[in-house]
Amino acid sequence: MLRTLEKATQKSVPLTVEDLGIEPHIFLDVAEKCGYQPVFTPHQKGTSVKLKKANIPVVMLYDANESKSFNFLDLSDLHVGHPKFDPRELEKILSRYYRNGKPLVDYVFIAGDLLEGITTDYYTYKMLEENKEERNRVINTRNIQVNQLLNILEKYDFDYRVINGNHEYGYEILGLEPPLRILERKMRAKGKRFTFYDTYMVDFIIAGVCKRMMHLESFDMRPGVIPTYDRLRKFKKNGGLWVRYKGKKYPIRFFQCGHLHHRQEVYDGSTKIFITQPGSFVKTEMVYAPGILVRGRILDNKSVIRE
């Protein structure tokens, strides 16, 4: 799904199942929720579409007049439902920042792929429309994954902020309700703070600056290429490294990326942006312990001081 969205921002794509790999109405629905504006043109197969980035959703958490401090935990790529998912490692890091029934961080940001999803190409939208038994089988898999994660997260009363990854979109491609929407309902029914943004990229205003969280569409594996740097260059070229909220500009100072499955922190001095890749909770990929604590304060010149 995400690579198809990325492809459609670069060139027109025929609006057919064969070319998109998914049902056109689902593709357009997801594109709209992710802040894209479709531009349609005639094509020999009917209609083609090219996506224009209209806006990235912006969420105000708190501005500099409320606090110039920040204190949050970055996570991504839990992959609950994967045979090698490590629930003990997830509980370990959540409990580290939770003492005596109180969180030690203001927010927990999770940048997609909370669930393993459906990783086989066997299922299709049409199949599930026509075959109730197969549809129920996929729904059961989704519900098992959702409930497994629910049983972990509900123990820790954090303020969770989460987005989709490519694995969650696997369910939407099949025409099913977004699993993280279901998880949000279940968490809130238990009185927990859990906010799901039905997109793969969202901006948060924190202490007078912007934190951009996204699940990378794809990444370049060539030696010497840092995928997050490459993405920042594209952001800079296509609109700048700042966001506007209610007429006020906020510089991007934090950039959290999911999808890469390796833990890394990078500070880019040229843009003054801290990049975090929180790692994966798949046992065979945990060279370094996943999760990154981001704590400090913002100076008057919008520079970041990490503690």
Where are the regions a protein language model picked out?
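Beta-strand-turn-beta hairpins that frame and shape the catalytic cleft
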Residues: 60-73, 203-213, 269-273
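Extended, solvent-exposed, turn-rich assembly/linker loops in the middle of proteins
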Residues: 184-191, 205, 212, 217
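Acidic, histidine-bearing metal-coordination/catalytic regions of metal-dependent phosphoesterases
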Residues: 1-74, 79
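Short acidic low-complexity segments
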Residues: 194-204
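Conserved beta-sheet core of the metallophosphoesterase superfamily
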Residues: 210-212, 219-307
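Core catalytic region of metal-dependent phosphoesterases/phosphodiesterases
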Residues: 61, 85-196
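Active-site neighborhood of phospho(di)ester-bond hydrolases with catalytic His/Asp-centered motifs
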Residues: 74-77, 106-113, 160-166, 195-197, ...
